[in-house]
Amino acid sequence: MPAKLLVGVLTEEKGLVSDVASALVDRFGPVDMVSCWMPFTDTSYYEKEMGGPLFRRIFAFSHLVNQGGLADIKLCTNALEDEFSRDGNRRVNIDPGFLLHSRFVLASAKDFTHRIYIGKGIYADLTLTYSAGAFRVLPWTFPDYTVQAMIGFLTDVRRRYDASFHLPDSFTPVATKD
Protein backbone atom coordinates (compact mmCIF):
# COMPACT_ATOMS: atom_id res chain seq x y z
CA MET A 1 0.00 0.00 0.00
CA PRO A 2 1.40 3.44 -0.82
CA ALA A 3 2.35 5.61 2.14
CA LYS A 4 2.12 9.29 3.01
CA LEU A 5 5.61 10.80 3.05
CA LEU A 6 6.42 13.10 5.96
CA VAL A 7 9.71 14.89 6.49
CA GLY A 8 10.72 16.53 9.75
CA VAL A 9 13.18 19.42 9.68
CA LEU A 10 15.03 20.25 12.89
CA THR A 11 17.01 23.49 13.06
CA GLU A 12 18.00 26.52 15.06
CA GLU A 13 17.69 28.68 11.92
CA LYS A 14 13.97 28.95 11.16
CA GLY A 15 14.70 31.22 8.18
CA LEU A 16 16.64 28.41 6.50
CA VAL A 17 13.59 26.16 6.36
CA SER A 18 12.04 27.83 3.31
CA ASP A 19 15.15 26.89 1.28
CA VAL A 20 15.10 23.37 2.73
CA ALA A 21 11.39 23.06 1.91
CA SER A 22 12.05 24.16 -1.69
CA ALA A 23 14.75 21.51 -2.02
CA LEU A 24 12.39 18.88 -0.59
CA VAL A 25 9.62 19.91 -3.02
CA ASP A 26 12.09 19.63 -5.93
CA ARG A 27 12.78 16.03 -4.91
CA PHE A 28 9.43 14.77 -3.57
CA GLY A 29 6.76 16.98 -5.10
CA PRO A 30 4.25 19.37 -3.56
CA VAL A 31 3.55 19.69 0.15
CA ASP A 32 -0.08 19.53 1.26
CA MET A 33 0.30 20.03 5.03
CA VAL A 34 2.85 21.77 7.26
CA SER A 35 2.99 21.56 11.05
CA CYS A 36 3.46 24.47 13.40
CA TRP A 37 6.95 25.02 14.80
CA MET A 38 7.51 22.67 17.73
CA PRO A 39 10.25 23.27 20.31
CA PHE A 40 12.80 20.46 20.49
CA THR A 41 13.71 20.39 24.17
CA ASP A 42 13.91 16.74 25.24
CA THR A 43 17.59 16.23 24.43
CA SER A 44 20.67 18.35 23.83
CA TYR A 45 22.06 15.72 21.40
CA TYR A 46 22.15 18.08 18.38
CA GLU A 47 23.00 21.38 20.11
CA LYS A 48 26.79 21.06 19.99
CA GLU A 49 26.63 20.74 16.20
CA MET A 50 23.59 22.90 15.40
CA GLY A 51 23.29 25.36 18.29
CA GLY A 52 20.04 26.05 20.08
CA PRO A 53 17.31 26.43 20.85
CA LEU A 54 16.10 23.96 18.23
CA PHE A 55 12.69 23.68 16.60
CA ARG A 56 11.02 21.04 14.42
CA ARG A 57 8.54 21.47 11.58
CA ILE A 58 6.96 18.57 9.68
CA PHE A 59 6.10 18.62 5.97
CA ALA A 60 3.56 16.17 4.53
CA PHE A 61 3.75 15.55 0.79
CA SER A 62 0.85 15.28 -1.63
CA HIS A 63 2.16 12.33 -3.61
CA LEU A 64 2.05 8.94 -1.93
CA VAL A 65 5.26 6.91 -1.96
CA ASN A 66 6.24 3.26 -2.16
CA GLN A 67 7.18 2.02 1.32
CA GLY A 68 10.15 0.19 -0.20
CA GLY A 69 11.71 3.52 -1.14
CA LEU A 70 12.28 4.72 2.43
CA ALA A 71 16.01 3.94 2.43
CA ASP A 72 16.55 5.93 -0.78
CA ILE A 73 14.51 8.82 0.63
CA LYS A 74 16.67 8.86 3.78
CA LEU A 75 19.85 8.86 1.69
CA CYS A 76 18.45 11.80 -0.29
CA THR A 77 17.65 13.77 2.88
CA ASN A 78 21.09 12.94 4.30
CA ALA A 79 22.60 14.46 1.14
CA LEU A 80 20.43 17.56 1.65
CA GLU A 81 21.75 17.89 5.21
CA ASP A 82 25.25 17.95 3.72
CA GLU A 83 24.25 20.56 1.12
CA PHE A 84 22.98 22.89 3.84
CA SER A 85 25.91 22.29 6.22
CA ARG A 86 28.45 24.96 7.08
CA ASP A 87 32.07 24.32 8.08
CA GLY A 88 31.34 20.60 8.43
CA ASN A 89 28.40 21.11 10.80
CA ARG A 90 24.81 20.41 9.95
CA ARG A 91 22.44 23.35 10.13
CA VAL A 92 19.42 21.09 9.67
CA ASN A 93 18.57 17.55 10.66
CA ILE A 94 16.11 16.08 8.16
CA ASP A 95 14.10 13.03 9.22
CA PRO A 96 11.88 11.33 6.62
CA GLY A 97 9.21 8.82 7.46
CA PHE A 98 5.89 7.58 6.27
CA LEU A 99 2.41 7.29 7.61
CA LEU A 100 -0.04 4.48 6.95
CA HIS A 101 -3.49 3.90 8.38
CA SER A 102 -2.06 1.86 11.26
CA ARG A 103 1.40 3.30 11.93
CA PHE A 104 4.00 6.02 11.60
CA VAL A 105 7.55 4.95 10.69
CA LEU A 106 10.74 7.03 10.66
CA ALA A 107 13.98 6.25 8.84
CA SER A 108 17.27 6.19 10.73
CA ALA A 109 20.91 5.50 9.95
CA LYS A 110 21.37 4.28 13.53
CA ASP A 111 20.73 0.66 14.51
CA PHE A 112 18.85 -0.15 17.69
CA THR A 113 17.02 -3.18 19.10
CA HIS A 114 13.58 -2.23 17.73
CA ARG A 115 14.74 -1.00 14.31
CA ILE A 116 14.58 -3.16 11.20
CA TYR A 117 17.30 -2.96 8.57
CA ILE A 118 15.82 -1.95 5.20
CA GLY A 119 19.03 -1.71 3.17
CA LYS A 120 21.69 0.82 2.19
CA GLY A 121 22.66 1.43 5.84
CA ILE A 122 19.14 2.56 6.80
CA TYR A 123 16.71 1.23 9.41
CA ALA A 124 12.94 1.58 9.81
CA ASP A 125 11.84 2.77 13.24
CA LEU A 126 8.23 2.00 14.13
CA THR A 127 7.56 5.25 15.99
CA LEU A 128 3.80 5.22 16.65
CA THR A 129 0.95 2.81 16.07
CA TYR A 130 -2.68 3.73 15.53
CA SER A 131 -5.46 1.73 17.17
CA ALA A 132 -8.79 2.30 18.89
CA GLY A 133 -9.04 5.78 17.40
CA ALA A 134 -5.69 7.21 18.52
CA PHE A 135 -1.96 7.12 17.99
CA ARG A 136 -0.20 4.93 20.55
CA VAL A 137 3.22 5.74 21.94
CA LEU A 138 5.73 2.90 22.14
CA PRO A 139 8.46 2.48 24.77
CA TRP A 140 11.07 3.79 22.30
CA THR A 141 9.05 6.62 20.74
CA PHE A 142 11.11 9.82 20.62
CA PRO A 143 9.72 12.24 23.24
CA ASP A 144 9.05 14.99 20.68
CA TYR A 145 6.70 12.61 18.84
CA THR A 146 4.59 12.14 21.99
CA VAL A 147 3.52 15.77 22.50
CA GLN A 148 -0.02 16.85 21.69
CA ALA A 149 0.99 19.25 18.89
CA MET A 150 2.77 16.41 17.06
CA ILE A 151 0.04 13.83 17.69
CA GLY A 152 -2.61 16.32 16.57
CA PHE A 153 -0.73 17.09 13.36
CA LEU A 154 -0.17 13.39 12.58
CA THR A 155 -3.85 12.71 13.24
CA ASP A 156 -4.80 15.42 10.73
CA VAL A 157 -2.36 13.98 8.17
CA ARG A 158 -3.80 10.51 8.76
CA ARG A 159 -7.34 11.80 8.09
CA ARG A 160 -6.20 13.26 4.78
CA TYR A 161 -4.33 10.05 3.91
CA ASP A 162 -7.37 7.90 4.71
CA ALA A 163 -9.63 10.22 2.71
CA SER A 164 -7.48 9.54 -0.35
CA PHE A 165 -8.59 5.90 -0.06
CA HIS A 166 -12.09 6.73 1.25
CA LEU A 167 -11.36 4.73 4.41
CA PRO A 168 -13.61 5.31 7.42
CA ASP A 169 -11.86 6.17 10.70
CA SER A 170 -12.99 2.81 12.11
CA PHE A 171 -11.32 0.83 9.27
CA THR A 172 -9.05 -1.98 10.44
CA PRO A 173 -6.78 -3.63 7.86
CA VAL A 174 -7.18 -7.39 7.55
CA ALA A 175 -4.30 -9.67 6.59
CA THR A 176 -4.86 -11.56 3.35
CA LYS A 177 -3.18 -14.58 1.81
CA ASP A 178 -1.20 -13.93 -1.35
What name fits each language-model region?
Residues 1-46, 52-56, 65-94, 98-177:
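Long, contiguous binding/interaction regions
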